[in-house]
Amino acid sequence: MLFLGMLKQVVNGTAQSKASSCRKLVLPLKFLGTSQHRIPADANFHSTSISEAEPPRVLITGGLGQLGVGLANLLRKRFGKDNVILSDIRKPPAHVFHSGPFVYANILDYKSLREIVVNHRISWLFHYSALLSAVGEANVSLARDVNITGLHNVLDVAAEYNVRLFVPSTIGAFGPTSPRNPAPDLCIQRPRTIYGVSKVHTELMGEYYYYRYGLDFRCLRYPGIISADSQPGGGTTDYAVQIFHAAAKNGTFECNLEAGTRLPMMYISDCLRATLEVMEAPAERLSMRTYNISAMSFTPEELAQALRKHAPDFQITYCVDPLRQAIAESWPMILDDSNARKDWGWKHDFDLPELVATMLNFHGVSTRVAQVN
């Protein structure tokens, strides 16, 4: 009935426009939208497109997670501090607050999100607000709200104001029936977590908005991301970050995945660079909306062996979490990212040896071992 009522408004509005000839006809069905707060059927849509010489005005949602602050730093070096606005619903630490513009942004508040985009003349939006795999399974209702309803709000605002939109996807978008070694860009996807389901929804909705409304939607399927200066956010690949904190603290680590569980991984600087590169890529070079990207693939035992080359006394034990193990076994072991490398020149810098050396150096482990020896 809601759709029929809105369709009636469209028909009536068309008739009135023909009769009066006083304004340009707007086709409101184009942006009926998917969010709870639908865009009015008689809305006029404005372009915030910028000249080639003008840097983009950037908004990052969910900016206090594992990737947001690092991405903001990278983009501010590229486009200027004042052109990149970090946002979240949490209070930022002092060093983040003073590093550049920060605003409160609740992606479930459609009106507020719209105001931020308009008031700050946003032309690029990086949507990082999401509950990750393990946390999402413990909070399915909240994950559904944040990962799906929040996405709908972002899609509608981006489409209305002609904003180039990036939303990350994940290895979690694949499922146990997907090819695992390797997983191509296009294959069957039947994930068994709310996080994975929401990311498949993201990929398909973004592609739909691209073809239906012309939204410049871009998406990368991230592998497990390893970062030195941020805490893991509740994902199944978190062990690959936690192991370095443990090595620095006491030289031992208890892993919640089995020793031979192979998953694709990437160092954070490669991840952030790939994100910027795909956003800057000319539209004509992109053959698809969602790309796999990858750098390396390893097991917990292989990571521990690489770590022992720097800290020979490091010890790893295993206490497997059945939930996380089941999730990991449903994910690809290797991602095929040949399309990203071919279309827009993706190339990673960090393999496992470089990753381990960088992480240990950040935590001071390599320095301490060198002094002891």
Swiss-Prot record:
Disulfide bonds: none annotated. Its EC number is 1.1.1.103. Changing R180K: Decreased L-threonine 3-dehydrogenase activity. No effect on protein NAD(+)-binding. No gross effect on protein folding. No effect on protein stability. Keywords: Mitochondrion, NAD, Oxidoreductase, Transit peptide. One of its GO terms (cellular component) is mitochondrion. GO terms for biological process: L-threonine catabolic process to glycine; threonine catabolic process. The active site is at Y195. It catalyses: L-threonine + NAD(+) = (2S)-2-amino-3-oxobutanoate + NADH + H(+). It is an enzyme of class 1 (oxidoreductase). SUPFAM superfamilies: NAD(P)-binding Rossmann-fold domains. Belongs to the NAD(P)-dependent epimerase/dehydratase family. This is L-threonine 3-dehydrogenase, mitochondrial. The gene is Tdh.
